[in-house]
Amino acid sequence: MLDKSVFCKIVTKDQLDCLQINHPKFMAEICIQGAQLTQFTPTGEQAYLWLSPDAEYQKGQGLRGGIPICWPWFGGLSMNPDQVKTQTKPTELAHGFVRTMDWSIREYRESAHEINIVMGISHSEASLAIWPFEFDLSCHFKLSNTLNVELKTTNLSSSNMYFSQALHSYFPTSDIHNTKILGAEKQNYVDALDLWKTKQQVESIAINKEVDRIYFGKSDYRILTPEHATCVKSNSLSSVIWNPWINKSKRLSQFSDNAYQSMLCIESANALEDAVSLPSLKSHTLKLNISR
C-alpha cells in the first residue's frame, strides 16, 4: 500500500515498526503497535504533541507520549462503571489492550495538501479471552496543517457493548508554571486525587500540583503556554486533565523526574458517566481536532 508513497515509509525503532511521514506541510510518526501517533509537527511550527525523551519502543508495552489509544476501558478497570467492569475479566491492565497490539493499515491516501491514514484492529482469540465481544475498531488520521483523529467502534456482537475510552493526548510546554487551560470554567469535575469527589471549576486551570481530574461538559479547550495557544476540540462529554507533578514523576516509567515541567495531558474521553453503551451492529465515533 505504501510502495508508491512519496511521503511515507516504514521505519523500525528498536522493537517497533512506525510510519514515518515527511510531507511539505508537516512531519508525523505513527507506531503500528497501538496505532499511536507519536509526533505531529506542521512545517515551520513547534511540535503539537509531547513525546518523552525516555520513550521506549518496546513490544507489548505502552509508549509514553503522543496520543495513546485507551480502549475498551480507560484507566484502571476497577475505577470504571459497573457495566464496563462486569463485562471484562479481572485484570491489572490499565487503559485496555489495543494500545499494545499491532494494528493494520487499511487505507492510505496522500496529496500535496494532506494525508489520510486509516488503521484498524478487530477481535481475536487474545482479545476475546479478556473481553467477550466481537468488534471492529478503526482510527482515521487526517493530517495537514491541523490534526484530526476519529476513533470508530463497531459492535459486531449480538448483545449490548459497554466501554470507556480516551485519546490520551500529551501536549508540550516550556514551563508548566506559566501554562493554563481555558474552556473548563463552570464545568463539574471528578477529582481522582481527593476521594473521587465532584467539584466545580471556577477559573481557568493552572497546574501547580499533581492533577488528575475528569471534566464533564463540552470538550473545547485552549492551552496557553509561553510559546503558543493550542485548541483541543472533541465531540466527547468528558475530558481528563493530567499532570503527575513531582512525586509521581519519580515513579513513572519512561518519564524523567523533571518531565512534569514540560508536559500536560488533555485526554478526549468517554469516561465514568460518559461511558458508551453501544447496541449490536451499531457504531460510535470519538472525534478529536488539534489546531493552533
Region roles according to the model:
Residues 100-101, 204-278:
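Acidic/His-leaning functional-site neighborhoods
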Residues 160-162, 166-240:
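Active-site/ligand-binding surface loops and adjacent short beta/alpha elements
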Residues 30, 151-157, 292:
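Asparagine-centered strand-capping/turn motif at beta-strand->loop junctions
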Residues 61-96, 182-188, 197:
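Beta-strand/loop-rich accessory regions of lumenal/periplasmic or secreted enzymes
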Residues 88-143:
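Extended, loop-rich substrate-binding clefts of extracytoplasmic carbohydrate-active enzymes
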